[in-house]
Amino acid sequence: MKAIVIGAGIGGLSAAVALKQSGIDCDVYEAVKEIKPVGAAISVWPNGVKCMAHLGMGDIMETFGGPLRRMAYRDFRSGENMTQFSLAPLIERTGSRPCPVSRAELQREMLDYWGRDSVQFGKRVTRCEEDADGVTVWFTDGSSASGDLLIAADGSHSALRPWVLGFTPQRRYAGYVNWNGLVEIDEALAPGDQWTTFVGEGKRVSLMPVSAGRFYFFFDVPLPAGLAEDRDTLRADLSRYFAGWAPPVQKLIAALDPQTTNRIEIHDIEPFSRLVRGRVALLGDAGHSTTPDIGQGGCAAMEDAVVLGAVFRQTRDIAAALCEYEAQRCDRVRDLVLKARKRCDITHGKDMQLTEAWYQELREETGERIINGMCDTILSGPLG
Protein backbone atom coordinates (compact mmCIF):
# COMPACT_ATOMS: atom_id res chain seq x y z
CA MET A 1 0.00 0.00 0.00
CA LYS A 2 1.26 3.46 -0.87
CA ALA A 3 0.19 6.84 0.47
CA ILE A 4 0.75 10.20 -1.14
CA VAL A 5 1.30 12.97 1.39
CA ILE A 6 0.88 16.52 0.11
CA GLY A 7 2.75 18.97 2.32
CA ALA A 8 6.04 18.65 4.20
CA GLY A 9 5.20 20.88 7.14
CA ILE A 10 4.59 19.70 10.69
CA GLY A 11 1.37 17.86 9.78
CA GLY A 12 2.60 16.24 6.58
CA LEU A 13 5.85 14.98 8.07
CA SER A 14 4.07 13.70 11.19
CA ALA A 15 1.59 11.86 8.96
CA ALA A 16 4.34 10.35 6.82
CA VAL A 17 6.20 9.10 9.89
CA ALA A 18 3.00 7.65 11.40
CA LEU A 19 2.04 5.84 8.19
CA LYS A 20 5.55 4.47 7.72
CA GLN A 21 5.44 3.12 11.29
CA SER A 22 2.21 1.37 10.32
CA GLY A 23 3.91 -0.30 7.35
CA ILE A 24 2.64 1.99 4.60
CA ASP A 25 5.02 3.41 2.00
CA CYS A 26 4.79 7.19 1.64
CA ASP A 27 5.75 9.64 -1.06
CA VAL A 28 5.88 13.21 0.26
CA TYR A 29 5.43 16.24 -2.00
CA GLU A 30 5.92 19.89 -1.04
CA ALA A 31 4.76 22.89 -3.07
CA VAL A 32 7.68 25.20 -2.35
CA LYS A 33 11.32 24.64 -3.22
CA GLU A 34 12.45 25.68 0.25
CA ILE A 35 10.25 25.64 3.34
CA LYS A 36 10.23 28.93 5.24
CA PRO A 37 7.97 28.49 8.28
CA VAL A 38 5.34 31.16 8.91
CA GLY A 39 5.90 32.40 12.44
CA ALA A 40 9.00 32.33 14.60
CA ALA A 41 8.01 29.63 17.08
CA ILE A 42 5.25 27.29 18.14
CA SER A 43 3.87 26.14 21.49
CA VAL A 44 3.95 22.36 21.69
CA TRP A 45 1.88 21.46 24.76
CA PRO A 46 2.08 18.04 26.43
CA ASN A 47 -0.46 16.45 24.06
CA GLY A 48 1.80 17.39 21.14
CA VAL A 49 4.96 16.40 23.01
CA LYS A 50 3.44 12.95 23.66
CA CYS A 51 2.56 12.62 19.99
CA MET A 52 6.12 13.46 18.96
CA ALA A 53 7.46 10.85 21.39
CA HIS A 54 4.93 8.31 20.08
CA LEU A 55 6.18 8.99 16.55
CA GLY A 56 9.81 8.50 17.60
CA MET A 57 10.67 12.20 17.56
CA GLY A 58 10.65 12.87 21.29
CA ASP A 59 14.34 13.78 21.26
CA ILE A 60 13.54 16.80 19.08
CA MET A 61 11.26 18.14 21.78
CA GLU A 62 13.71 17.45 24.58
CA THR A 63 16.59 19.08 22.71
CA PHE A 64 14.85 22.11 21.25
CA GLY A 65 11.97 22.75 23.67
CA GLY A 66 12.46 25.86 25.80
CA PRO A 67 12.62 25.78 29.63
CA LEU A 68 9.01 26.77 30.34
CA ARG A 69 8.33 26.36 34.08
CA ARG A 70 6.05 29.26 35.04
CA MET A 71 3.33 31.53 33.68
CA ALA A 72 2.54 35.13 34.50
CA TYR A 73 0.13 37.81 33.32
CA ARG A 74 1.24 41.39 33.87
CA ASP A 75 -0.57 44.71 33.88
CA PHE A 76 0.11 46.57 30.65
CA ARG A 77 0.94 49.92 32.29
CA SER A 78 2.62 49.08 35.60
CA GLY A 79 4.22 45.82 34.46
CA GLU A 80 3.29 44.29 37.83
CA ASN A 81 2.14 40.69 38.03
CA MET A 82 -1.62 40.21 37.91
CA THR A 83 -0.98 36.50 38.51
CA GLN A 84 2.07 34.25 38.51
CA PHE A 85 2.18 30.49 39.02
CA SER A 86 4.21 27.34 38.48
CA LEU A 87 3.41 24.92 35.65
CA ALA A 88 4.55 21.98 37.82
CA PRO A 89 0.92 20.89 38.47
CA LEU A 90 0.24 20.83 34.71
CA ILE A 91 3.38 18.76 34.08
CA GLU A 92 2.46 16.36 36.88
CA ARG A 93 -1.12 15.89 35.67
CA THR A 94 -0.33 15.54 31.97
CA GLY A 95 2.89 13.56 32.29
CA SER A 96 4.95 15.84 30.08
CA ARG A 97 6.42 19.33 30.02
CA PRO A 98 5.37 21.95 27.47
CA CYS A 99 8.00 22.61 24.81
CA PRO A 100 7.91 25.97 23.03
CA VAL A 101 10.17 25.53 20.01
CA SER A 102 11.51 27.56 17.12
CA ARG A 103 9.51 26.70 13.99
CA ALA A 104 12.66 26.70 11.87
CA GLU A 105 14.35 24.20 14.21
CA LEU A 106 11.27 22.00 14.46
CA GLN A 107 10.83 21.98 10.68
CA ARG A 108 14.53 21.24 10.10
CA GLU A 109 14.70 18.42 12.63
CA MET A 110 11.48 16.76 11.45
CA LEU A 111 12.66 16.99 7.85
CA ASP A 112 15.98 15.40 8.80
CA TYR A 113 14.17 12.66 10.73
CA TRP A 114 12.02 11.79 7.72
CA GLY A 115 14.84 12.36 5.22
CA ARG A 116 15.21 15.44 3.02
CA ASP A 117 15.91 13.25 0.01
CA SER A 118 12.55 11.56 0.59
CA VAL A 119 10.62 14.79 -0.06
CA GLN A 120 9.99 16.07 -3.57
CA PHE A 121 10.06 19.87 -3.44
CA GLY A 122 8.58 22.33 -5.93
CA LYS A 123 5.50 20.14 -6.44
CA ARG A 124 2.39 22.31 -6.23
CA VAL A 125 -0.89 20.40 -6.55
CA THR A 126 -3.55 21.52 -9.02
CA ARG A 127 -6.14 18.75 -8.73
CA CYS A 128 -6.80 15.16 -7.80
CA GLU A 129 -8.96 12.33 -9.13
CA GLU A 130 -10.03 9.05 -7.61
CA ASP A 131 -11.00 5.78 -9.25
CA ALA A 132 -11.48 2.19 -8.16
CA ASP A 133 -7.74 1.54 -8.19
CA GLY A 134 -6.52 4.57 -6.26
CA VAL A 135 -6.03 8.31 -6.36
CA THR A 136 -3.95 10.54 -8.65
CA VAL A 137 -2.74 14.10 -8.15
CA TRP A 138 -1.43 16.50 -10.77
CA PHE A 139 1.15 19.21 -10.21
CA THR A 140 1.74 22.58 -11.84
CA ASP A 141 4.88 21.26 -13.58
CA GLY A 142 2.70 18.83 -15.54
CA SER A 143 3.75 15.73 -13.60
CA SER A 144 1.44 13.46 -11.61
CA ALA A 145 1.61 10.92 -8.80
CA SER A 146 -0.63 7.99 -7.89
CA GLY A 147 -1.20 6.01 -4.74
CA ASP A 148 -3.75 4.04 -2.78
CA LEU A 149 -4.63 6.97 -0.53
CA LEU A 150 -3.90 10.68 -0.31
CA ILE A 151 -3.23 12.77 2.79
CA ALA A 152 -3.84 16.46 2.14
CA ALA A 153 -1.60 18.28 4.63
CA ASP A 154 -1.18 21.32 2.41
CA GLY A 155 -2.01 24.00 4.97
CA SER A 156 -4.70 26.57 5.61
CA HIS A 157 -4.77 27.54 1.91
CA SER A 158 -5.22 23.86 0.91
CA ALA A 159 -5.71 23.24 -2.80
CA LEU A 160 -7.24 19.83 -2.11
CA ARG A 161 -9.74 20.85 0.57
CA PRO A 162 -12.47 21.93 -1.91
CA TRP A 163 -12.35 18.48 -3.52
CA VAL A 164 -12.90 16.80 -0.15
CA LEU A 165 -15.60 19.19 1.07
CA GLY A 166 -17.38 19.84 -2.22
CA PHE A 167 -17.12 23.61 -1.73
CA THR A 168 -14.46 26.26 -1.11
CA PRO A 169 -14.67 27.57 2.47
CA GLN A 170 -13.78 31.16 3.19
CA ARG A 171 -11.11 32.07 5.70
CA ARG A 172 -12.49 34.25 8.52
CA TYR A 173 -10.45 37.22 9.71
CA ALA A 174 -10.16 36.92 13.49
CA GLY A 175 -9.88 40.67 13.94
CA TYR A 176 -6.27 41.09 15.00
CA VAL A 177 -2.73 41.34 13.71
CA ASN A 178 0.14 39.38 15.25
CA TRP A 179 3.81 40.37 15.07
CA ASN A 180 6.27 37.68 16.16
CA GLY A 181 9.97 36.91 16.24
CA LEU A 182 12.93 35.87 18.39
CA VAL A 183 15.19 37.90 20.69
CA GLU A 184 17.91 36.97 23.16
CA ILE A 185 16.66 36.27 26.68
CA ASP A 186 17.05 39.34 28.87
CA GLU A 187 15.80 39.26 32.45
CA ALA A 188 14.91 42.95 32.08
CA LEU A 189 12.21 41.79 29.67
CA ALA A 190 10.95 38.76 31.62
CA PRO A 191 12.25 35.73 33.56
CA GLY A 192 13.97 33.25 31.26
CA ASP A 193 11.89 30.25 32.38
CA GLN A 194 8.49 31.92 32.27
CA TRP A 195 5.75 32.56 29.73
CA THR A 196 5.07 36.23 30.45
CA THR A 197 2.12 38.08 28.93
CA PHE A 198 1.34 41.78 29.29
CA VAL A 199 -2.38 42.47 28.74
CA GLY A 200 -4.54 45.58 28.44
CA GLU A 201 -6.70 47.54 25.97
CA GLY A 202 -7.62 44.31 24.17
CA LYS A 203 -3.97 43.88 23.21
CA ARG A 204 -1.21 41.62 24.46
CA VAL A 205 2.56 41.22 24.40
CA SER A 206 4.03 37.81 25.16
CA LEU A 207 7.48 36.34 25.76
CA MET A 208 8.12 32.60 25.90
CA PRO A 209 11.51 30.84 26.22
CA VAL A 210 12.69 28.63 23.37
CA SER A 211 16.09 26.95 22.98
CA ALA A 212 19.53 28.57 22.77
CA GLY A 213 18.79 31.38 25.23
CA ARG A 214 16.09 33.05 23.17
CA PHE A 215 12.58 34.37 23.76
CA TYR A 216 9.81 33.86 21.26
CA PHE A 217 7.87 37.11 21.38
CA PHE A 218 4.60 38.26 19.92
CA PHE A 219 2.45 41.39 19.90
CA ASP A 220 -1.32 41.25 19.21
CA VAL A 221 -3.36 44.30 18.19
CA PRO A 222 -7.04 44.35 17.10
CA LEU A 223 -6.95 46.05 13.67
CA PRO A 224 -8.78 46.05 10.34
CA ALA A 225 -7.37 43.68 7.73
CA GLY A 226 -5.33 44.99 4.85
CA LEU A 227 -3.48 47.92 6.44
CA ALA A 228 -0.42 49.16 4.54
CA GLU A 229 2.14 48.19 7.16
CA ASP A 230 5.42 46.41 6.58
CA ARG A 231 8.90 45.95 8.04
CA ASP A 232 9.88 49.52 7.17
CA THR A 233 7.24 50.90 9.55
CA LEU A 234 7.25 48.04 12.05
CA ARG A 235 9.02 49.62 15.01
CA ALA A 236 7.10 52.89 14.63
CA ASP A 237 3.82 50.97 14.31
CA LEU A 238 4.45 48.98 17.49
CA SER A 239 5.62 52.07 19.38
CA ARG A 240 2.35 53.77 18.46
CA TYR A 241 0.11 50.80 19.32
CA PHE A 242 1.88 50.23 22.65
CA ALA A 243 2.47 53.82 23.74
CA GLY A 244 2.29 54.05 27.53
CA TRP A 245 2.88 50.33 28.06
CA ALA A 246 5.34 49.09 30.68
CA PRO A 247 9.13 49.55 30.27
CA PRO A 248 9.80 45.88 29.32
CA VAL A 249 7.42 46.26 26.37
CA GLN A 250 9.27 49.38 25.21
CA LYS A 251 12.59 47.57 25.65
CA LEU A 252 11.32 44.65 23.55
CA ILE A 253 10.24 46.99 20.75
CA ALA A 254 13.72 48.53 20.79
CA ALA A 255 15.46 45.12 20.89
CA LEU A 256 13.60 43.31 18.10
CA ASP A 257 14.91 43.10 14.54
CA PRO A 258 12.27 44.41 12.10
CA GLN A 259 13.84 42.39 9.27
CA THR A 260 13.19 39.08 11.03
CA THR A 261 9.88 40.01 12.68
CA ASN A 262 6.78 38.55 11.05
CA ARG A 263 3.47 40.42 10.65
CA ILE A 264 0.48 38.11 10.25
CA GLU A 265 -3.23 38.87 9.94
CA ILE A 266 -4.82 36.07 11.95
CA HIS A 267 -7.56 33.95 10.37
CA ASP A 268 -9.43 30.76 11.04
CA ILE A 269 -12.02 28.72 9.13
CA GLU A 270 -15.41 27.50 10.32
CA PRO A 271 -15.03 23.86 11.43
CA PHE A 272 -15.98 21.22 8.87
CA SER A 273 -18.43 18.34 9.25
CA ARG A 274 -16.13 16.05 7.30
CA LEU A 275 -12.41 15.46 6.86
CA VAL A 276 -12.52 12.59 4.36
CA ARG A 277 -13.81 11.88 0.88
CA GLY A 278 -13.12 8.41 -0.47
CA ARG A 279 -9.38 7.81 -0.40
CA VAL A 280 -8.49 11.42 0.47
CA ALA A 281 -8.15 12.78 4.02
CA LEU A 282 -7.50 16.30 5.27
CA LEU A 283 -4.89 16.68 8.00
CA GLY A 284 -3.51 19.60 10.00
CA ASP A 285 -4.39 23.15 8.97
CA ALA A 286 -5.99 21.84 5.78
CA GLY A 287 -8.62 20.19 7.97
CA HIS A 288 -8.87 22.62 10.88
CA SER A 289 -7.40 26.07 10.41
CA THR A 290 -7.40 27.78 13.81
CA THR A 291 -6.24 30.94 15.51
CA PRO A 292 -3.17 30.45 17.72
CA ASP A 293 -4.94 31.58 20.89
CA ILE A 294 -4.76 28.28 22.77
CA GLY A 295 -1.53 27.11 21.14
CA GLN A 296 -3.03 23.92 19.74
CA GLY A 297 -2.67 24.24 15.95
CA GLY A 298 0.54 22.26 15.64
CA CYS A 299 -0.46 19.86 18.41
CA ALA A 300 -3.72 19.08 16.60
CA ALA A 301 -1.80 18.17 13.43
CA MET A 302 0.42 15.84 15.45
CA GLU A 303 -2.68 14.27 17.01
CA ASP A 304 -4.15 13.76 13.52
CA ALA A 305 -1.02 11.87 12.50
CA VAL A 306 -1.06 9.63 15.57
CA VAL A 307 -4.71 8.70 14.96
CA LEU A 308 -4.04 8.13 11.25
CA GLY A 309 -1.25 5.71 12.05
CA ALA A 310 -3.40 3.92 14.62
CA VAL A 311 -6.37 3.33 12.31
CA PHE A 312 -4.13 1.76 9.67
CA ARG A 313 -2.64 -0.57 12.26
CA GLN A 314 -6.18 -1.78 12.95
CA THR A 315 -7.19 -2.36 9.32
CA ARG A 316 -5.86 -2.16 5.76
CA ASP A 317 -9.35 -1.34 4.48
CA ILE A 318 -8.77 2.25 3.35
CA ALA A 319 -12.42 3.31 3.49
CA ALA A 320 -12.87 1.85 6.98
CA ALA A 321 -9.60 3.32 8.26
CA LEU A 322 -10.27 6.83 6.96
CA CYS A 323 -13.86 6.69 8.20
CA GLU A 324 -12.53 5.89 11.68
CA TYR A 325 -9.93 8.67 11.40
CA GLU A 326 -12.71 11.14 10.60
CA ALA A 327 -14.89 9.84 13.43
CA GLN A 328 -12.09 10.24 15.97
CA ARG A 329 -10.92 13.66 14.79
CA CYS A 330 -13.94 15.72 13.68
CA ASP A 331 -15.35 16.59 17.10
CA ARG A 332 -11.92 17.02 18.66
CA VAL A 333 -10.66 19.53 16.10
CA ARG A 334 -13.99 21.38 16.04
CA ASP A 335 -13.68 21.80 19.80
CA LEU A 336 -10.13 23.14 19.49
CA VAL A 337 -11.00 25.64 16.74
CA LEU A 338 -14.01 26.97 18.65
CA LYS A 339 -12.15 27.10 21.99
CA ALA A 340 -9.41 29.12 20.30
CA ARG A 341 -11.99 31.43 18.72
CA LYS A 342 -13.68 32.06 22.07
CA ARG A 343 -10.33 32.74 23.74
CA CYS A 344 -9.37 35.01 20.83
CA ASP A 345 -12.48 37.16 21.18
CA ILE A 346 -12.05 37.63 24.92
CA THR A 347 -8.33 38.35 24.70
CA HIS A 348 -8.67 40.86 21.88
CA GLY A 349 -11.58 42.94 23.14
CA LYS A 350 -14.39 41.93 20.81
CA ASP A 351 -16.63 42.83 23.76
CA MET A 352 -14.50 44.99 26.07
CA GLN A 353 -16.84 44.34 28.98
CA LEU A 354 -15.95 40.63 28.80
CA THR A 355 -12.29 41.44 28.31
CA GLU A 356 -12.21 43.73 31.36
CA ALA A 357 -13.94 40.99 33.37
CA TRP A 358 -11.17 38.62 32.26
CA TYR A 359 -8.51 41.08 33.42
CA GLN A 360 -10.20 41.15 36.82
CA GLU A 361 -10.26 37.34 36.91
CA LEU A 362 -6.53 37.32 36.24
CA ARG A 363 -5.95 39.54 39.28
CA GLU A 364 -7.72 36.92 41.41
CA GLU A 365 -6.19 33.89 39.64
CA THR A 366 -4.11 31.38 41.62
CA GLY A 367 -3.22 29.37 38.53
CA GLU A 368 -5.64 26.57 39.35
CA ARG A 369 -8.40 27.66 36.95
CA ILE A 370 -6.02 28.26 34.04
CA ILE A 371 -4.19 24.97 34.58
CA ASN A 372 -7.49 23.08 34.86
CA GLY A 373 -8.57 24.50 31.51
CA MET A 374 -5.27 23.64 29.87
CA CYS A 375 -5.29 20.12 31.29
CA ASP A 376 -8.83 19.58 30.02
CA THR A 377 -7.69 20.47 26.50
CA ILE A 378 -4.45 18.49 26.68
CA LEU A 379 -5.87 15.31 28.24
CA SER A 380 -8.69 15.12 25.68
CA GLY A 381 -6.11 14.21 23.02
CA PRO A 382 -5.71 10.68 21.62
CA LEU A 383 -2.83 9.78 23.96
CA GLY A 384 -4.47 11.23 27.08
From Swiss-Prot:
Reaction it catalyzes: urate + NADH + O2 + H(+) = 5-hydroxyisourate + NAD(+) + H2O
Domain of life: Bacteria
Major enzyme class: oxidoreductase
Binding site for FAD: G11, E30, A31, S43, V125, D285, G295, Q296, G297, G298, C299
Gene Ontology biological process: purine nucleobase metabolic process; urate catabolic process
Alphabetical list of Pfam families matching this protein: FAD_binding_3
Single GO molecular function: oxidoreductase activity, acting on paired donors, with incorporation or reduction of molecular oxygen, NAD(P)H as one donor, and incorporation of one atom of oxygen
Entry EC number(s): 1.14.13.113
SUPFAM superfamilies: FAD/NAD(P)-binding domain
Phenotypic effect of disruption: Mutants show impaired utilization of both hypoxanthine and uric acid as nitrogen sources.
Residues marked Involved in substrate activation for the transfer of oxygen from the flavin hydroperoxide (site): R204
Keywords assigned: FAD, Flavoprotein, Monooxygenase, NAD, Oxidoreductase, Purine metabolism
Pathway named in the protein's UniProt entry: Purine metabolism; urate degradation
Record: residues binding substrate: N178, R204, Y216, F217, F218
Keyword Cytoplasm in record: no
Cofactor: FAD
Family label: Belongs to the FAD-dependent urate hydroxylase family.
NCBIfam families: urate_HpxO (NF033623)
Record function comment: Catalyzes the hydroxylation of uric acid to 5-hydroxyisourate.
Listed name of the protein: FAD-dependent urate hydroxylase
Organism listed in the record: Klebsiella pneumoniae
